[in-house]
């Protein structure tokens, strides 16, 4: 009986094994950041380490992450880790604790830089989960399609697109009023009163994270941590990028470095961001 009791206690202790991480935006996707501590890993069998980790947050969302191995240590697979980081808008020195609950299931507790625990998902994540794409009348192009079409034109050009917006029928009559408005753009660098946009010049440090001037921050950006979806103009590639606010400063953090490498961006480029939704942008790049 005593031996069984000791075995049960050992199993319970193993279930409660835990480790922590402090997330720094510069190396948030590195193997070292994704590494599992040696003292933590050695209490698990090879069979257990061949399974996926299932990470569950306080509000119920969960993520599955493969476990990989190099000659020195075990670590969390990159795409699963980056999905977890992006969904939770992490990358600004958050303190995370991972607690094993058995069968490679983990709970994660996320503490912000100010010491407060995150008890609900970031605003944009809950917004995206609850929202649906708006319906469009047949034959009317979306703004995203309009901007993508512009980016494929060459040299100087001028496009004028008419959008029709039908007003709802009045309750006492069947008259319908059509509103017609147009969006004119002279070139890829021209501004439009109908499209919110801003431009940034790429410096070397901006290939890792992009800091915004106060003028852009106050006019265009949210006042809290948010996940932005940034599209390539051809609309075939997009990136989830974390926008973080730290005091009076703000920047694109987790996910931005990957975008800069894959787009790709280079020092001297001019980046123009055009809004197509509240937290969704198209990125146009002009080379020097």
Curated annotation (Swiss-Prot):
SMART domains of this UniProt entry? Answer: B3
- Which residue ranges does the Swiss-Prot or TrEMBL entry mark as DNA-binding? 19-114, 196-288
The record's GO CC annotations read: nucleus
Q: Which domain of life is it from?
A: Eukaryota
Q: Does the keyword Protein biosynthesis apply?
A: no
What's the main place this protein lives? nucleus
- Output the SUPFAM superfamilies linked to this UniProt entry: DNA-binding pseudobarrel domain
Tell me the keywords, alphabetical order.
DNA-binding, Nucleus, Repeat, Transcription, Transcription regulation
Please give the PANTHER family that the UniProt record associates with this protein: B3 DOMAIN-CONTAINING, B3 DOMAIN-CONTAINING PROTEIN REM23
The identity of this protein, by name, is: B3 domain-containing protein At2g35310
- What species is this protein from? Arabidopsis thaliana
């Amino acid at each position: 009986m005593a031996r069984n009791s000791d075995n049960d206690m050992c199993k319970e202790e193993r279930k409660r094994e835990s480790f922590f991480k402090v997330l720094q935006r510069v190396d948030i996707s590195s193997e070292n950041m994704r590494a599992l501590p040696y003292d933590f890993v050695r209490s698990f069998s090879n069979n257990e380490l061949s399974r996926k980790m299932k990470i569950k947050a306080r509000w119920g969302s969960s993520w599955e992450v493969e476990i990989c191995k190099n000659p020195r240590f075990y670590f969390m697979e990159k795409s699963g880790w980056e999905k977890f980081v992006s969904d939770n808008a992490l990358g600004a020195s958050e303190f995370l604790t991972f607690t094993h609950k058995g069968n490679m299931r983990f709970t994660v507790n996320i503490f912000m830089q100010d010491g407060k625990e995150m008890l609900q998902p970031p605003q944009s994540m809950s917004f995206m989960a609850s929202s649906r794409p708006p319906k469009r009348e047949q034959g009317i192009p979306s703004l995203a399609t309009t901007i993508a079409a512009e980016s494929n034109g060459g040299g100087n050009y001028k496009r004028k697109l008419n959008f029709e917006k039908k007003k709802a029928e009045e309750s006492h009559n069947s008259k319908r009023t059509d509103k017609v408005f147009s969006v004119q753009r002279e070139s890829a660098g021209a501004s439009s009163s109908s499209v919110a946009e801003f431009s940034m010049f790429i410096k070397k440090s901006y290939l890792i994270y992009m800091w915004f001037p106060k003028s852009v921050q106050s006019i265009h950006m949210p006042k809290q941590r948010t996940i932005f979806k940034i599209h390539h103009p051809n609309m075939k590639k997009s990136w989830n990028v974390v926008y973080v606010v730290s005091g009076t400063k703000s920047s694109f953090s987790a996910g931005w470095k990957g975008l800069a490498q894959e787009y790709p961006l280079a020092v001297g480029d001019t980046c123009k961001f055009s809004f197509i939704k509240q937290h969704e942008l198209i990125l146009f790049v002009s080379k020097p």
